[in-house]
Curated annotation (Swiss-Prot):
GO terms for biological process: cell division; proteolysis involved in protein catabolic process. The keyword Acetylation does not apply. InterPro entries: AAA+_ATPase (IPR003593), ATP-dep_Clp_protease_ClpX (IPR050052), ATPase_AAA_core (IPR003959), Clp_ATPase_C (IPR019489), Clp_protease_ATP-bd_su_ClpX (IPR004487), ClpX_bact (IPR046425), P-loop_NTPase (IPR027417), Znf_CppX_C4 (IPR010603). It holds the Pfam family zf-C4_ClpX. Belongs to the ClpX chaperone family. GO terms for cellular component: HslUV protease complex. Residues 4-57 form the ClpX-type ZB domain. Keywords: ATP-binding, Chaperone, Metal-binding, Nucleotide-binding, Zinc. This is ATP-dependent Clp protease ATP-binding subunit ClpX.
Length: 426
């Protein structure tokens, strides 16, 4: 019950029954049967309820851990090809979250952490694989670019900033962040320039590898709370990185030469050498499948860093057939995305088979893989997306090979004619 105190001339002054503040000290006072509650107390109650829900939800998520088969099936819906990499990732991710679910040593055996290293050319699906799994598991996901990282104390981004980004993704909920997935791209760019230790300081190469070691293996990272250094009086958040799954990826351009050099050692020189013909030469993707940890050391990664990434998966370069599939088959395929965009204008969008082949050929020529497909399609549809909102009675837009090659404009089919087709005019 609130104590209603008289203010004299102004009558009764109302007070919050919980905190005791008067109606003049708060923005809103909600009245009940002989009880009053202020807006500040309502907000406080909401915060308490939210915190309790957060504590319960991670346990519920753990009970619903998908099997490797289910993880693989979900990846198949969004990622074309890369079958071996999907299987490796599904098993590694399942084992990681199974380890978290059964925390503590099992019969005296402490389960190690299985971070992942993905090797594959640009646009082969490294980032997409990690991101798709994180979305399916409903865990926080963040990306970091290894080329922007430097050792602490130097100009650049500290490795601890990676954990801060992860915390930002889950509104600084430490428990949730500790179940997250971190993808570090361009990991090959921090390789040292030679496999001999350098006497000079390498703050963006070997130095970053050294800085990442503990973070990836598992340590208690001290991260500034929301607001960072602007509020130095606040305590730092303690994040246990041993529960975070780290996935590192890179193109590792030139690694195939290191592998070939190793595999050809001992085949003889001069007249005793085994000369390989054109038919014997393996593709770059086939060569990368034979990668060993010693090849990565020769490439420039330090042995300790490779040891923290025990799960290795190699992704093949996407061929024309795979690129065509990527354009049309996944749940979020580009053609489906743009078809949905055109549907908002009540217009049907059709890509003919020859158009898909021409788009795939363009991406192959640019050597951008699947990553370059969107920019190509955006360029093809730019003019028609500009004109369509101002054009009446268009029922369908058709894209064929000549449109992709820039030889003609998209075919427009109008509502008021069953078979009328006309080129889009500026």
């Amino acid at each position: 019950m609130s104590d209603n105190k008289s203010t004299g001339d102004s009558g009764k002054l109302l007070y919050c029954s919980f905190c005791g503040k008067s109606q003049h000290e708060v923005r809103k006072l909600i009245a009940g049967p002989s009880v009053y509650v202020c807006d500040e107390c309502v907000e406080l109650c909401n915060d308490i309820i939210r915190e309790e829900i957060k504590e319960i939800s991670p346990k519920q998520d753990q009970d619903k851990l998908p099997t490797p088969h289910e993880l693989r099936a979900h990846l198949d819906d969004y990622v074309i090809g890369q079958e071996k990499a999907k299987k490796v990732l599904s098993v590694a991710v399942y084992n990681h979250y199974k380890r978290l679910k059964n925390a503590g040593p099992k019969d005296g055996v402490e389960l190690g952490k299985s971070n992942i290293l993905l090797i594959g050319p640009t646009g082969s699906g490294k980032t997409l694989l990690a991101e798709t799994l994180a979305r399916f598991l409903n865990v926080p996901f963040t990306m970091a670019d290894a080329t922007t990282l430097t050792e602490a104390g130097y100009v650049g981004e500290d490795v601890e900033n990676i954990i801060q980004k992860l915390l930002q993704k889950c509104d600084y909920d430490v428990e949730k962040a500790q179940r997250g997935i971190v993808y570090i791209d361009e990991i090959d760019k921090i390789s040292r320039k030679s496999d001999n230790p350098s006497i000079t300081r390498d703050v963006s190469g070997e130095g970053v590898q050294q800085a990442l070691l503990k973070l990836i293996e598992g340590t208690i990272a001290a991260v500034p709370p929301q607001g960072g250094r602007k509020h130095p009086q606040q305590e730092f958040l303690q994040v246990d990185t041993s529960k975070i799954l780290f996935v590192c990826g890179g193109a590792f351009s030139g690694l195939e030469k290191v592998i070939e050099q190793r595999s050809h050692t001992g085949t003889g020189i001069g007249f005793g050498a085994q000369v390989k013909g054109e038919d014997d030469k393996a593709t770059i993707s086939d060569t990368l499948m034979q990668v060993e940890p010693e090849d990565l050391v020769k490439y420039g990664l330090i042995p300790e860093f490779i040891g923290r990434l025990p799960v290795l998966a190699t992704l093949a370069e996407l061929d024309d057939a795979a690129l065509i599939q990527i354009l049309s088959e996944p749940k979020n395929a580009l053609t489906k995305q743009f078809a949905a965009l055109f549907e908002m204008e009540d217009v049907e969008l059709e890509f003919r088979e020859d158009a898909l082949k021409a788009i795939a050929l363009k991406a192959k020529t640019r050597k951008t893989g699947a990553r370059g497909l969107r920019s190509i399609v955006e360029g093809i549809l730019l003019d028609i997306m500009y004109d369509l909102p101002s054009t009446d009675n268009v029922a369908k837009v058709v894209i064929d090979e000549s449109v992709v090659k820039g030889e003609s404009t998209p075919i427009l089919i109008y509502e008021n004619s069953e078979s009328q087709a006309a080129s889009a005019e500026q």
